[in-house]
Amino acid sequence: MDKRSLKLKRGAVAVLAVLGLLGAYGLGSLQPWSAAHAETAVSAPVAAPALPLPTGLPDMSAIVARNAPAVVNVSVAGKVRRTAEAPDFPSLEPGDPFYEFFRRFQGAQPHGEQRVRGQGSGFIVREDGVILTNAHVVDGADEVTVRLADKREFKAKVIGADKATDVAVLKVEARGLPVVKTGASAKSRVGEWVLAIGSPFGFESSATAGIISALSRALPDENYVPFIQTDVAVNPGNSGGPLFNMAGEVIGINSQIYSRSGGYQGLSFAIPIEVAMKVEAQLMKTGQVQRGRL
């Protein structure tokens, strides 16, 4: 072998050795860099928490089973005076329990007084028979009957009604009645699921569900109530019924709907339970609500 050939081979070995060192260094340094990079990526602060993956619609059957016995149907009867020349009909909203009656029978009996009936919902807050409902459900009624889910019926006394908040308190003579658990609407968030139980069109213990659409909603001429807006199906007869959160707690009283057709259009409004319970406390104590004035 000549010297020139030997030098070439040694040069090749030297080059291969260098390449081998570079390759080893590259392979050796690749893994630690990747691990360090991955570790940095994992520990880096995240702009927003990851949202839980959807798991399907919530099962509300347990809430209904637990609370339906404490939701009541409220039937009212009253008298309306009419004259032939100028029928004296009150201005009613589509959600009012008397609305459908007047729509169908307006002008049918032109003279004297007419006996009218209506329906709404309510719920028991004390086992000795204290019930919350809407003031407009019992407005003008001289007879109020409460029907429980177990078909028992009681004559109810109107302890008091506050038109400003649309809250009324009824009392029946009974003991050991099922009651709802009240929660805090202030802890609610837009987008949360809610459930209503009531008697739409007289169909007792009907459950409907939806989400909270907005909180602290102000409505025209409603200065005292920061309404909970939902898309829960609420129809005539639901008025006065409870609105539950997914913990099975009452967070509101279904009170009004917004509709151009007279039926449900996805805009329902509930009175926060905190407002209702403050009114209940005053009505139970004095029969009226006192408000501070400047």
Regions found by a protein language model. Name each.
Residues 1-6:
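N-terminal Lys/Arg-rich, disordered targeting/topogenic segments
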